């Protein structure tokens, strides 16, 4: 029975038609923080308690009322004129959506729900889409607003230079729609009109997740079937959807395609994977974040996993998020988390024995330091898991648990957008201005369309050291990119690896090494990689000249002659565009009259160099205007 995967084949198929009722949570992009507020992070592992923080009390009452008005129909949470789930993967966010709008996983397990339906005019953020799959949910790209055109077919432009949108069909709260899962179409209530193609939401793999109640069941089901078949000495029955293989003979490989081909598991010899292929890949580095860590622990316990996968090069449990609010709840939860993860086989930011001092550096900064191969795949429990070496994917707590337990992950090879630079950066400009200018120039080159969304940003800045490259790659999370890759030259990569070695050595000197010798192993791997580069055996990762890209963006550095500011356009006539960071302006736009209500320097996307710049600005101001007084709680 197990060798035939009857545990899966005997499950009921998903419904042919799903009747849904819409609930618009907000206009514009919806952050996962709306579904699971960061301020309530301490309760994420307690689903009943954390569920009370979902959106607002008012929204919860409206959702309950819709359920009563439409018995037998499922609710669909919508980001009107925006993207659903930006900012992070946030497993607790999709858990909350499922709790309020999904279906109970088992009558014997309270507050654990699955199968939520979420949607956005511009689809689902890539990092959140994975989390939707974990719960066997459906993520719908509505496309219900389109560019308005004049009689000549040209886009009509808004007061901020972006295209004016017009409504193609309504999804106002309380609208009844039908999802045809066989035809993969979104229909009006009586099924007479096709509103949108939703085939992206119903790939063969996604349908399996829906049928099984989540992606983990499929991952472990496959392992169970293979184990049973090997035990019996028979071939496993072909039950699960075959992995999609996209291969174009004669076509070169982008950087991410090279990394995936290097790390792919179970691919027939000689098969080359291009964008669109489904791949099981070996993971090199895994990071667990401290506010989602308790949920990762729950997942590991549910998997009966007791020790870290031996195929991983490195794994780290951070203590950064709770460090800034070291309250009673954090003090109660964090030591237990560190003790579990340390015993499981991770290097931990806090010492369960209390010997070495706490290392509260931001998780992605540490992961950047312990990544010692430009061909590595990194999985991290934080949306800003973006490295200057290798390719890194932010992931939900469950995917992190899978990577820790199995040392592998299922990922579709993403398309890439190539970003190159021309001209020279002025001496008085900061690299942050290049980051902002990239966004502004990309939007200008593609008529306001964000071509980065859901794709890899392949950045060609060969001489950029790890910390600067990290500033760029970290920002790509804000542009809804799937991930990013920095293409270095040989000398720069060697220098970045030497920096990584020195920082790992500091961790060893502090006493953070674990019995497996993981940190020393990373230094040894860095030495090996440096030797490969110096000998010419394996130079720094580069794409092939004949690689195919979804788009190419050229950033003109000569155009950047003054600081750039990302400033929400709160007066935009389109409500959905008032609170996004897509409006980039030069500082001269404000004429020196911009009022600043609050200043904060210290996000995960800055480093000490940025703080030095701010300090110098204040010194200059003090020289001109006298002493500056601070009135901030964290200074």
Task: Name every feature range the model reports, one short phrase each.
Residues 1-635:
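Fe-S-dependent hydro-lyases/dehydratases of central metabolism
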């Amino acid at each position: 029975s197990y060798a035939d995967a009857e545990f899966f084949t005997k499950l009921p198929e998903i419904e042919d038609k799903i009747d849904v009722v819409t609930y618009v949570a907000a206009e514009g992009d919806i952050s996962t923080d709306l579904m699971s507020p960061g301020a309530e992070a301490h309760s994420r592992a307690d689903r009943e308690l954390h569920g009370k923080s979902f959106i607002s009390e008012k929204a919860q009452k409206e959702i309950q009322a819709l359920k009563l008005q439409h018995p037998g129909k499922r609710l669909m949470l919508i980001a009107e004129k925006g993207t659903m789930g930006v900012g992070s993967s946030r497993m607790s966010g999709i858990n909350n959506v499922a709790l309020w709008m999904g279906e109970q996983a088992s009558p014997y397990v309270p507050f654990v729900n699955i199968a939520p339906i979420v949607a956005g005019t511009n689809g689902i953020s890539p990092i959140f889409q994975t989390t939707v799959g974990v719960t066997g949910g459906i993520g719908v790209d509505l496309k219900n607003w389109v560019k308005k055109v004049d009689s000549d077919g040209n886009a009509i432009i808004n007061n901020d230079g972006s295209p004016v949108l017009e409504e193609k069909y309504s999804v106002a709260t309380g609208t009844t729609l039908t999802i045809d899962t066989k035809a993969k179409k979104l229909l009006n209530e009586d099924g007479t009109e096709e509103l949108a193609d939703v085939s992206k939401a119903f790939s063969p793999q996604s349908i399996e997740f829906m049928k099984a109640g989540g992606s983990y069941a499929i991952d472990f089901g496959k392992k169970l079937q293979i184990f049973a078949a090997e035990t019996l000495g028979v071939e496993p029955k072909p039950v699960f959807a075959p992995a999609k293989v996209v291969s174009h003979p004669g076509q070169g490989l982008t950087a991410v395609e090279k990394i995936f081909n290097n790390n792919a598991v179970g691919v027939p010899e000689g098969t080359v994977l291009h964008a669109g292929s489904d791949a099981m890949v070996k993971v090199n580095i895994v990071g667990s974040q401290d506010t989602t860590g308790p949920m990762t622990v729950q997942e590991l316990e549910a998997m009966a996993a007791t020790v870290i996968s031996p195929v991983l090069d490195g794994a780290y449990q951070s203590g950064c998020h709770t460090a800034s609010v070291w309250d009673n709840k954090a003090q109660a939860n964090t030591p237990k988390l560190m003790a579990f993860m340390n015993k499981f086989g991770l290097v931990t930011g806090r010492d369960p024995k209390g010997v070495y001092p706490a290392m509260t550096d931001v998780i992605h900064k540490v992961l950047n330091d312990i990544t010692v191969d430009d061909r590595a795949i990194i999985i991290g429990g934080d949306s800003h898991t973006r490295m200057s070496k290798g390719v890194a994917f932010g992931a939900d707590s469950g995917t992190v648990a899978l990577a820790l337990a199995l040392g592998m992950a299922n990922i579709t090879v993403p398309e890439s957008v190539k970003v190159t630079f021309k001209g020279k950066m002025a001496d008085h400009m900061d690299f942050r201005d290049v980051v902002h200018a990239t966004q502004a120039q990309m939007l200008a080159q593609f008529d306001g369309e964000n071509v980065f969304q859901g794709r890899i940003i392949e950045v060609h800045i060969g001489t950029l050291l790890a910390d600067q490259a990290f500033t760029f790659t970290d920002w790509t999370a804000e542009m809804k990119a799937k991930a990013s890759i920095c293409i270095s030259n040989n000398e720069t990569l060697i220098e970045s690896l030497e920096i990584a070695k020195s920082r790992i050595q500091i961790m060893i000197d502090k006493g953070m090494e674990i019995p497996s010798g993981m940190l020393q192993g990373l230094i040894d791997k860095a030495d090996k990689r440096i030797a490969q580069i110096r000998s010419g055996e394996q130079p720094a990762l580069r794409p092939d000249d004949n690689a195919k890209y979804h788009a190419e963006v050229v950033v003109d550095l000569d155009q950047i002659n003054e600081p750039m500011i990302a400033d929400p356009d709160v007066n935009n006539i389109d409500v959905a565009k008032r609170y996004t960071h897509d409006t980039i302006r030069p500082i001269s736009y404000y004429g020196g009259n911009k009022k600043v209500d609050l200043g904060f320097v210290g996000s995960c996307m800055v480093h000490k160099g940025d703080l030095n710049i701010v300090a110098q600005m204040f010194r200059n101001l003090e020289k001109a205007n006298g002493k500056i007084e601070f009135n901030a709680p964290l200074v």
